[in-house]
């Protein structure tokens, strides 16, 4: 598979990221013992710049949805960091997530689902979504377990989940997320959804404590700068990313950050680090910042 990266005996295949043209951090991680599908969700926003999605965005959405469904066929375990629809697939018909009930059944069937606690450290909106998901998993006979601060062993592979960290800065109304560390005898890969930098210092410390070979992480949402994301939090995120780049192997920095046309200017110091790349760059593909350029794609610039 052309998009597959290797770190020791761990294979990593990024499936959906903003640099591929969609909202997602879906990733397939394979070790000699277990294959894990991380955050199997994808979405495009109904409105950006007051405009509906361009044709290219719909095409990218379908492409990534197909990638996720194919990856699920290979997976033994599915992990869910939180309950936003770009990070899990609901048992609902949703146009902007390219899913319906059958999509979800095919995705979760016969897999072990390790998920964020649906009742603790969660906001009301995500609690409703979590309840809807777990109820349907139970109806379908799908095994699931709460993963917060727990470890699961599969042969010589260990899946280690973080405590719930804020979805961005401390005190955010967006709730909490889990990070996932996949560890084998000779490599470590870490997936950090929606920590937005990270802004929160304890999240940084958990991410770097074992000096992972690869970190896949969501950058700060600079497209919301001055609206829902402050300059102070951007400075924290930048400082933490610079520190991270010195303490880990490779960094794939993507997701929220790439909804901003000027994302490289916002974090120019970070991208000067030789080990920080987008998901598209990591796999040798051209970046497709479709949401960020929706105005141009729609001829409304």
What are these regions (language model features)?
Residues 1-73, 126-202, 288-301:
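Core dinuclear metal-dependent hydrolase active-site scaffold
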Residues 22, 83-89, 120-124, 196-201, ...:
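Active-site environment of divalent metal-dependent phosphoester hydrolases
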Residues 34-35, 107-113, 246-251, 273-274:
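A short helix->loop->beta-strand "cap" motif at the edges of active sites that frequently abuts
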Residues 37-41, 75-86, 114-117, 190-195, ...:
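Active-site neighborhood of phospho(di)ester-bond hydrolases with catalytic His/Asp-centered motifs
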Residues 52-114, 205, 209-216, 223-224:
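Active-site metal-binding motif and surrounding structural segment of the metallo-beta-lactamase
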Residues 93, 202-207, 240, 266:
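A short acidic, amphipathic alpha-helical/loop segment
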Residues 97, 175, 208, 230-240:
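Charged helix-capping and loop-helix junction motifs
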Residues 232-301:
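Binuclear metal-ion centers of metallo-dependent hydrolases, dominated by the metallo-beta-lactamase
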């Amino acid at each position: 598979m052309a998009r597959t990266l290797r770190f020791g005996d761990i294979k990593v295949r990024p499936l959906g990221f903003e640099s591929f043209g969609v909202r997602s951090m879906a990733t397939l991680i394979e070790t000699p013992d277990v294959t894990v599908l991380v955050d199997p969700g994808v979405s495009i926003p109904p409105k950006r710049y007051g405009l509906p999605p361009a044709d290219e965005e719909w095409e990218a959405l379908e492409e990534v949805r197909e990638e996720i469904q194919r990856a699920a066929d290979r997976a033994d375990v599915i992990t869910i960091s939180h309950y936003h629809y770009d990070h899990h697939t609901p048992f609902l018909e949703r146009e902007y997530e390219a899913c319906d009930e059958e999509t979800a059944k095919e995705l979760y069937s016969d897999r072990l689902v390790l998920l964020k606690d649906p009742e603790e450290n969660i906001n009301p909106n995500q609690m409703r979504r979590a309840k809807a998901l777990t109820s349907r998993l139970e109806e379908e006979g799908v095994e699931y377990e709460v993963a917060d601060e727990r470890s699961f062993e599969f042969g010589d592979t260990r899946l280690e989940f973080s405590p719930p960290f804020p979805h961005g800065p401390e005190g955010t109304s967006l709730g909490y997320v889990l990070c996932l560390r996949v560890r084998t005898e000779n490599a470590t890969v870490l997936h950090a959804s929606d920590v937005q930098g990270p802004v929160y210092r304890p999240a940084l410390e958990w991410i770097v404590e074992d000096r992972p070979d690869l970190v896949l992480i969501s950058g700060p949402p600079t497209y919301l700068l001055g609206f829902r994301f402050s300059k102070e939090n951007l400075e924290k995120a930048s400082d933490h990313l610079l520190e991270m780049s010195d303490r880990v192997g490779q960094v794939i920095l993507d997701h929220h950050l790439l909804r901003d046309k000027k994302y490289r200017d916002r974090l120019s110091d970070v991208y000067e680090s030789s080990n920080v790349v987008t998901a598209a760059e990591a796999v040798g593909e051209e970046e497709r910042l479709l949401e960020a350029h929706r105005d141009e794609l729609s001829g409304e610039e």
